[in-house]
Amino acid sequence: MVLDEYMWMVIVGFIIAFVLAFSVGANDVANSFGTAVGSGVVTLRQACILASIFETIGSVLLGAKVGETIRKGIIDVNLYNNTVDLLMAGEVSAMVGSAVWQLIASFLKLPVSGTHCIVGATIGFSLVAVGAHSVQWMQLVKIVASWFISPLLSGLMSGALFLMIKFFILNKEDPVPNGLKALPVFYAATIGINVFSILFTGAPLLGLQTFPVWATALLSVGIAIVFALVVWFFVCPWMKKKIASRLKKEGALSRISEESLDKIQDEDTSVFKELPGAKGNDESVLPLTSSSPDAAVSSESVSNGNTRVPYGRAASMTNGSIRSPFSNGTFNFDGHTVKSDAHVYHTVHKDSGLYKDLLHNIHLDRVKIDRSAPENNYRILRRNNSYTCYTAAICGVPVHSTFKSSDIAMPEDSEKLVGDTVSFSKKRLRYDSYSSYCNAVAEAEIEAEEGGVEMKLAAELADPNPPQDDSLEEDKEEKDKSQVHLLFHFLQILTACFGSFAHGGNDVSNAIGPLVALWLIYQQGGVMQEASTPVWLLLYGGVGICAGLWVWGRRVIQTMGKDLTPITPSSGFTIELASAFTVVVASNIGLPISTTHCKVGSVVAVGWIRSRKAVDWRLFRNIFLAWFVTVPVAGLFSAGVMAILQYGILPYV
């Protein structure tokens, strides 16, 4: 059968296939490198470079076999024997439906399954072209089951693995000995699982599609053992020296900082003489500032009878810590009157960078000659570090240096004060490495009021009987120790690269599977598509995936690596390894599984174990709803395009 009159559909198909590959790169590649970027082991640029390399290699070596299912496993192609043009139009429609929904999901920063997109789109066009009897509905049942099986199974495996790592390594006072002992096991598991996955999938170009399962398992175990021995005899000694060097360097820097600070404090300056706890104490509680710089030399009474305390003054001393209560009064916040109705205390340790910044800022305020036009040269206070609004209240540092209308375009995670109004976006508080120094959790509720700004500040440290919760434990668990970071740093990069390689082989079929079907139908003039997948088509899909990653991939990477829950190298490695193991096991025993759903389930499970409040459950709800609507929405888009082609274009061609 000569199909030259349908050459236009092939051309349109190639264009749309690139857009589809672009959408897959923008959305699905976050599965591989989202956690690595979130934990900080690689930058976004490095992740894009590594993912581009491994996605392309994986798509060429592994993509051919996986594409068979997408082309023939969802619909009965024999029903199109006498209507080849309808099948070609259907493949174009499927690519449009899948691409549109994945681009929408990427715009919304929601990770969705590329496989489910193309399956839903294929079902959509087939319902319009032939009817319900053309669809293999069991595939749809498996997809629905995977919504629950994938995240649950992967979450359980990730949680169990992370609890083991937490118990044997992270919770130890010195995690290095146990970490070094476990390192060969981790490398062996990573290599073994991923090698088995690659061999089990089969690479037609390498002649691996005929490997029996027992040979695949034996070869994977052998390679894993070899890597374990290499790590034990070469990597572990090198890692031990590197960790010792890092700790020695950190200790030297800490001593230098302490000596420098002590030397400064010994100088005969009024600034340090007046600072509470400047000598002889490891911690000081700095009070709120007075309502204006000029009032710092004298105390005033506030409405409730408490004393307003200037810089470096204290109202009371308890157990060597100087505390200043401040309640139901007002203070000056960069020229704006701010009211507070809560007691505010804040402990600042002398060995922290925050303490030194406070000293420096106070010194600058004291030595200024011209107070008529003060300048605020402080850095922007961002929600993601220790400079929160209560820190600003303590040292008189504004949230932003100016309050002009042009300042509205600030980073979305900053708190913004604009004139007499407040633009405040409530987000989940994230703790960082400063939490070991600042053991107070503050929550700010800022409301715009006529005639000024009302700020409600609360610090749990001020409560003599604080609630017995695990907030301090969560602070400590938020960041890995430097030794743990080094142990898991390269491990997470390795698992991410393997995951990217496997993803390229699996998901390139979602991008160019319909295009391969379209090309083979056009070449052979029939619907059976007996020829093998051309390598150049796989490479074409790989290039499209990389383009999408570079242009738009950061959106979903941010969701997977940062927004859903904070990631550390240890938790990121756990997520990568457990989700990969889940995919391999579930695929081998016939359970319906989705890589995207597995990764999201692992991220949520590990995040919940590390800190009960660390998971953004609202975001997870939105992701789950996106999974739920993926198949019907992609199917509707595809069905609409198919109806236009079948009834509006093909009859007139």
Curated annotation (Swiss-Prot):
InterPro entries: Phos_transporter. Homodimer. It holds the Pfam family PHO4. Sodium-phosphate symporter which preferentially transports the monovalent form of phosphate with a stoichiometry of two sodium ions per phosphate ion. Residues 290-303 have a biased composition (Low complexity). It is found in: Cell membrane; Apical cell membrane. The lineage of its organism: Eukaryota, Metazoa, Chordata, Craniata, Vertebrata. This is Sodium-dependent phosphate transporter 2. The chain crosses the membrane at residues 6-26, 47-67, 87-107, 110-130, 143-163, 188-208, 218-238, 484-504, 533-553, 573-587, 595-610, 623-643. Belongs to the inorganic phosphate transporter (PiT) (TC 2.A.20) family. PANTHER family: PHOSPHATE TRANSPORTER, SODIUM-DEPENDENT PHOSPHATE TRANSPORTER 2. Keywords: Cell membrane, Glycoprotein, Ion transport, Membrane, Phosphate transport, Receptor, Sodium, Sodium transport, Symport, Transmembrane, Transmembrane helix, Transport. Residues 27-46, 108-109, 164-187, 239-483, 554-572, 611-622 are cytoplasmic. GO terms for cellular component: apical plasma membrane; brush border membrane; plasma membrane. Residues 275-310 are annotated as: Disordered. Glycans are attached at residue 81. It is a multi-pass membrane protein. GO terms for molecular function: phosphate transmembrane transporter activity; sodium:phosphate symporter activity. One of its GO terms (biological process) is phosphate ion transmembrane transport. It comes from the Eukaryota. The keyword DNA damage does not apply. Residues 1-5, 68-86, 131-142, 209-217, 505-532, 588-594, 644-653 are extracellular.
